[in-house]
UniProtKB/Swiss-Prot annotation:
Top-level division of the source organism's lineage: Bacteria
Gene3D superfamilies per record: Luciferase-like domain
Protein name: Pyrimidine monooxygenase RutA
Lineage: Bacteria, Pseudomonadati, Pseudomonadota, Gammaproteobacteria, Enterobacterales
Role description: The FMN-N(5)-oxide reacts spontaneously with NADH to produce FMN. Requires the flavin reductase RutF to regenerate FMN in vivo.
Length: 363
């Protein structure tokens, strides 16, 4: 099973709590995180894109770096780990993304890929005057389908004459092309999102579910597997989890309860309000899971809370789910969390037993 880190491009990572570590996103922090992840044989690093935060006492995600420029910098200071940036496709023409991706492919030596998102948070785009209207909620995957076709043209032949409802290319050129086939990833959980991933993505992200229920996402992975079978492609699921680990189950649980007790209710209220704006995409979208009150303090990603041995066991359970090819991990404290994962959790995981021994220390 592949292991990735979801780098904290926004302030405070993924805990919406006054009791959680409070920090600003910086290049130096993310460099330290990704270099440490590479040292511990993580397979990939991904950054999201967020253009407006949730506010509240913690000013959650009000402070964000930009994904492509951050990952270009990280590509230059790593050597093995795969690097993925996220394109907010309403903000960037596909021909520009194609060229930026080809550039980072050159920087990284063929280790770069692109995560495509349609955009769900209306205020991110309204503030710039580029929100296309609420009809976009029901047409966003039509838009993304045209977008990725332009990308594939330009990365493949270096030329596109694509004509569609949203994009018109007229002998559009990009050169040089990427040195290896460019991977495209997506995070669709709605039927439309999975249908898109089945046709165009190399793999699809989905949310884990619940606290210490590592296989609860299995129906989502099964839906993705079924959608991919209909297109004759192999599109695996990569599952998002937060790891909160300590020496004992009780110590880890105490940290989790402490974070929940400090939940930033103002920021969470804003998230809930935004989740209700899209009335056209159905009930199975990512944002509706994020806003579910069950575990909103970490946007309802699956949460693994326990001793190092307990977390290792639960991750092996994740690996046993058909269609699950990897996990994307966040941590309550990224630097110590990755070190503890590499030193204390990963060596206990049967699904990572193939890894070579560590040979050097990392700062």
């Amino acid at each position: 099973m592949k292991i990735g880190v979801f780098v904290p491009i926004g302030n405070n990572g993924w805990l919406i709590s006054t009791h959680a570590p409070q920090y600003m996103p910086t290049f130096e922090l993310n460099k330290a995180i990704v270099q440490k992840a590479e040292h511990y044989h993580f397979d990939f690093a991904l950054s999201m894109i967020k253009l407006r935060g949730f506010g509240g006492k913690t000013e959650f995600w009000d402070h964000n770096l930009e994904s492509f420029t951050l990952m270009a910098g990280l590509a230059a200071v790593t050597s093995r780990i795969q690097i993925y940036a996220t394109a907010a496709t309403l903000t960037l023409p596909p021909a520009i993304v194609a060229r930026m991706a080809a550039t980072i492919d050159s920087i990284s030596g063929g280790r770069f890929g692109v995560n495509l998102v349609t955009g769900w948070q209306k205020p991110e785009y309204e503030q710039m005057g580029i929100w296309p209207g609420d009809d976009y909620f029901s047409r966003r995957y039509d838009y993304l389908t045209e977008y990725v076709q332009v990308l594939r043209d330009l990365w493949g032949s270096g030329k596109s004459d694509f004509k569609g409802d949203f994009f018109t290319m007229d002998d559009c050129r990009v050169s040089p092309q990427p040195s290896v086939p460019m991977k495209v990833i997506c995070a669709g959980q709605s039927d439309a999102g999975m249908a898109f991933s089945a046709r165009y993505a190399d793999f699809n992200f989905c949310f884990g579910k619940g606290v210490n229920t590592p296989t609860a996402f299995a129906p989502t992975a099964a839906r993705m597997k079924q959608a991919a079978e209909q297109t004759g492609r192999d599109v695996g699921s990569y599952v998002l989890f937060m790891v909160i680990a300590d020496e004992t189950d009780d110590a880890a649980r105490a940290k989790w309860e402490h974070y929940k007790a400090g939940a930033d209710e103002e920021a969470l209220s804003w998230l809930t309000e935004q989740s209700q704006k899209d009335t056209r995409s159905g009930t199975d979208t990512n944002v509706r899971q994020m806003a579910d009150p069950t575990s909103a303090v970490n946007i309802n990603m699956g949460t693994l809370v326990g001793s190092y041995a307990s977390v290792a066991r639960m991750l092996d359970e994740v690996a046993s789910v058909p269609g699950a090819e990897g996990v994307l991990l966040t941590f309550d404290d990224f630097l110590s969390g990755i070190e503890n994962f590499g030193e204390r959790i990963q060596p206990l995981m049967q699904c990572r037993a193939h890894l070579p021994a560590l040979t050097q220390e990392v700062a």
